[in-house]
């Protein structure tokens, strides 16, 4: 059904296919053990993009694992934990739909296990030790990583690497080789949240006039 619905867009074959490592810690919730913190790094966008001027306009850092950008989200989870093999824009939507069904069934099972008499808040010491704490959880758009240090009940350091941040450096290569009119389809497929905050600008190669400058719509 999902493939039939997307077929109406008449997307070119191979749109959005990108060959990068996957980032997925769990099929549904989150698993810190699956996050390779020792090989995690961030670089400034000026150092990542071929044109430093483009990097200066970016609003996020570029997170990397083993020095490479990654793919995170429903398709990455479905491939890593469920054997899903298709790639590209259509595959992103199909994987998202299949994952929603899986999570619906999981939610029903979890609701049946709820103990309404159990404590609603975990017992922990909020004074902190000054050591780095890392939390990893899977959101609808991908892996969410939060890092913090707390000492004497005060936050000393906090950083969030959200799915959009992981997805940004991967969506660029996923659009290469296709007409600019399909750029919005790639953005929507990889990161529906980002599509509401993205401009598509088309510049004439000869006279550098701006042919298009529109917001991407969800």
Model-derived regions: residue spans:
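Short beta-strand elements
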Residues: 144-162
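Active-site bordering "gate/hinge" segments
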Residues: 1-141, 151, 164-218
């Amino acid at each position: 059904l999902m493939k039939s619905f997307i077929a109406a867009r008449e997307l070119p074959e191979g749109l959005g296919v990108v060959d990068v490592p996957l980032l997925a810690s769990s099929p549904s919730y989150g698993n810190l053990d699956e996050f390779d913190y020792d090989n995690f790094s961030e670089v400034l966008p000026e150092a990542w993009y071929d044109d430093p001027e483009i990097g200066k306009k970016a609003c996020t850092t570029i997170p990397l694992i083993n020095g490479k950008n990654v793919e995170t989200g429903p398709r990455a989870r479905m491939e890593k934990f469920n054997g899903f093999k298709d790639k590209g824009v259509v595959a992103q939507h199909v994987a998202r739909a299949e994952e929603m069904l899986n999570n619906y069934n999981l939610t029903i099972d979890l609701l049946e296990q709820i103990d309404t008499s159990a404590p609603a808040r975990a017992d922990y010491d909020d004074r902190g030790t000054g050591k780095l704490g890392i939390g990893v959880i899977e959101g609808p758009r991908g892996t969410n990583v939060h890092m913090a240090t707390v000492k004497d009940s005060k936050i000393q350091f906090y950083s969030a690497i959200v799915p959009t941040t992981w997805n940004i450096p991967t969506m660029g290569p996923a659009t290469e080789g296709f007409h600019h009119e399909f750029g919005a389809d790639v953005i929507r497929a990889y990161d529906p949240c980002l599509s509401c905050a993205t401009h598509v600008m088309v510049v004439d190669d000869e006279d550098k006039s701006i042919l298009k400058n529109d917001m991407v719509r969800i």
